[in-house]
Design a protein with these regions (language model features):
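Glycan-recognition patch characteristic of GH18 chitinases/ENGases
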Residues: 1-102, 179-182
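Extracellular/periplasmic catalytic domains that process cell-envelope and extracellular macromolecules
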Residues: 19-23, 66-70, 75, 105-107, ...
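Solvent-exposed, polar/charged alpha-helical surfaces in well-ordered, non-transmembrane soluble domains
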Residues: 22, 61, 65, 94, ...
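Short acidic catalytic loops
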Residues: 27-31, 103-119, 170
Length: 206
């Protein structure tokens, strides 16, 4: 499986070719950030030299046209924002999940990826795991659901691992210590030993 992130600013600068888009099985648009109570804040791309899409909906529409005829999934990506406060509150977790589902339904999207960086202690891992479980509960099995983890932050609960369709592992940086192939392989082995099934693991490359 080839899963790729699409950010509007890079796309508008011509850094993502149509060939690359069409070669991907899964395209994730990092366009939404959670507020602490669960509402969504959308990030619109900036035009480059007066050209390019300037709304997240327009960006998705543009890419959808370029991958027409392929089996590529078109998904929403959630990141940053007040995610730690949101996942720590049961009502906010539910509101967030329901809001995501509404966006997926309205825009005919194939699913959601959570890229929340980073849980730093046991409580934050527990809260994040509960948010993952709530998202699956609200979405059901209709939508493709993944999370993005990192070798320094991957210890979500076993139930959360079971709840997602796959997990992408950012085992390529940003620290240069992760650049050697030996470190790349050992990071992958580490999360496998933790309990992430190999059939659910998508190892990242820069």
């Amino acid at each position: 499986m080839i899963s790729s992130y699409v950010r509007g600013h890079f796309y508008n600068r011509g850094r993502i070719s149509t060939e690359s888009l069409r070669a991907s099985d899964d395209l994730i648009f990092l366009s939404v950030h959670p507020n602490k109570d669960g509402p969504l804040l959308f990030e619109n791309p900036r035009a480059f030299q007066g050209k390019g899409e300037t709304t997240w909906e327009g960006l998705i529409k543009s890419v959808r046209g370029k991958v027409k005829g392929t089996k590529a999934k078109i998904r929403l990506g959630a990141s940053s924002g007040e995610w730690k406060a949101m996942v720590a509150d049961e009502a906010a977790r539910t509101t967030f999940a329901k809001n995501i589902k509404k966006v997926l339904e309205k825009n005919n999207l194939d699913g959601i990826d959570l890229d929340f960086e980073w849980a730093e202690n046991e409580k934050e891992y527990e809260d994040y795991s509960l948010a993952i479980l709530k998202m699956r509960e609200v979405l059901g099995d209709k939508y493709l659901f993944s999370v993005s983890l990192h070798p320094v932050c991957y210890k979500i609960s076993k139930k959360a691992i079971e709840a997602v369709d796959f997990i992408s592992l950012q085992c390529y940086g940003p620290s240069p210590v992760r650049f050697p192939i030996e470190k790349y392989c050992s990071d992958i082995q580490m999360v496998l030993e933790y309990g992430i099934p190999k059939e659910k693991l998508v190892a990242g490359v820069p």
